Amino acid sequence: RAAERGKCFIEYIPAENAWVPIEADGYIYINCMWIAGSMKGQGYSNELLAECLRDAAGQGRKGVCILSAEGRKREFLSDRKYMEHKGFSVADISDCGINLMYLPLAADALPPKFRECAKHPAVEGEGFVLYYTDQCPFTYYWVPRVQEAAAEHGIPLRVIHITDKETAQNAPAPVTTYALFREGKFVTQAIQSDKKFLALAGVE
C-alpha cells in the first residue's frame, strides 16, 4: 500500500474463467488495470503489467490478453497505444471498435479471438438495454439510479444483471462489466451516471 492518495491495482484471471466472450484458452486475461489520482505518471502501470507477465510466465500460460480502444471509446478500457508500446498486438476487433490485444509468451500460442456474439454486438428490442456484472463497484451504485431516472422519465430500459460465467461468456458485447444498447445497437461500455444517461436519452 502506497502512502499517496489514489488507486493503483491490476486484476487478472485465467482466460478460461474470464467473464467475457472470448476464446483464449491458456491465456491470462487482464480484467482491470487502474491507475488514478496522484499515482498517475509514476510508472506504476509498467510495474503492474510486468508483474502480471512474470506471473503468467511462471504459470506456464500461453500469453496475456486485454481489451482496449482508442479515443472516446477508451473509457474504462486500456489504451491501445500504450499496450502496443508494451509489445501487445491486436488479435481481434469488434464491430463497435473494441480491440482484443495479446502478448504471446509461448512460440506456439495462437491469437485469442472474440466469440461471434462479441464480434458483432447487437440485441433485440426497442429502447435501451443494459447488461452488467458486479465486477466493478461503480455499477452497484449507478445502475439503480439509472433505472430510477429511466422510470421517472418514461424511458424504455431493460436491465440484465449477469450473475454467472456461462452467461457472461455468451453476452452480446465484448465488455460485460457494463454494456449499454439503444434500439439494438451497442452504445457504450462507459458506466453512466443518471445525468449522463438522461443526456444520452435526449432529456434536458
Where does each model-flagged region fall?
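Non-catalytic, surface beta->alpha helical segment in thiol-disulfide oxidoreductase systems
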Residues: E183-E204
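C-terminal "cap" of GNAT-fold acetyltransferases
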Residues: D95-H120
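Conserved GNAT acetyl-CoA-binding A-motif
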Residues: A56-E75
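Conserved catalytic-core motifs of GNAT/GCN5-like acyltransferases
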Residues: L67, E84-M101, V187-A190
